Amino acid sequence: MLMLFFTVAMVHIVALMSPGPDFFFVSQTAVSRSRKEAMMGVLGITCGVMVWAGVALLGLHLIIEKMAWLHTIIMVGGGLYLCWMGYQMLRGALKKQDAAASSPHIELAQSGRSFLKGLLTNLSNPKAIIYFGSVFSLFVGDNVGAAARWGIFALITLETLAWFTVVASLFALPKMRRGYQRLAKWIDGFAGALFAGFGIHLIISR
């Protein structure tokens, strides 16, 4: 049983370390706003992971995969949301002035907005359900009891929270934030292009 948990933990940490929308959202929020705002986003992402993992654990992902129209709606909707986030970042990057021109002003988001953005960023990637469905199909057989299944669910949740907490803490360091202030418009522009790219990829790969 310990080997099962260890295997799932290793597979999930590799998946977490692969840069994607969640990583870029947390890192960009941490350097441009604050660690607190980034952590709200981390909580939102973690809740999104709980939704996808719960759906896979209950076997509901099989229903979504068989209902092609629902799968298409989820893919297109998620892609459009990521494109919208990319557009917002690109527009913000174009409006930014050089950091050397004036003292940077950090505008904090309204309470809960970063949480919602983190949640929607994670839920907008329906490929997560394929990932979690594969994990549970490969490693969680019929011989695995309910307690172990929910133990794996808790492991995935805590691992996600821990990893993105580390990411938020690192990118919120003063040195990282000073570097961001010098290159703010380029970093935001790059992040915006990535989000738009993720969104377009979701739409055309549906």
Swiss-Prot record:
It is found in: Cell inner membrane. The chain crosses the membrane at residues 1-21, 44-64, 67-87, 150-173. Residues 22-43, 88-149 are periplasmic. It comes from the Bacteria. Keywords: Cell inner membrane, Cell membrane, Membrane, Transmembrane, Transmembrane helix, Transport. GO terms for molecular function: amino acid transmembrane transporter activity. GO terms for cellular component: plasma membrane. Residues 65-66, 174-206 are cytoplasmic. It is a multi-pass membrane protein. Its main location: membrane. The keyword Phosphoprotein does not apply. Pfam families: LysE (PF01810). Conducts the efflux of threonine. NCBIfam families: 2A76, PRK10229.1. Belongs to the Rht family. This is Threonine efflux protein. It comes from Salmonella typhi. The gene is rhtC.
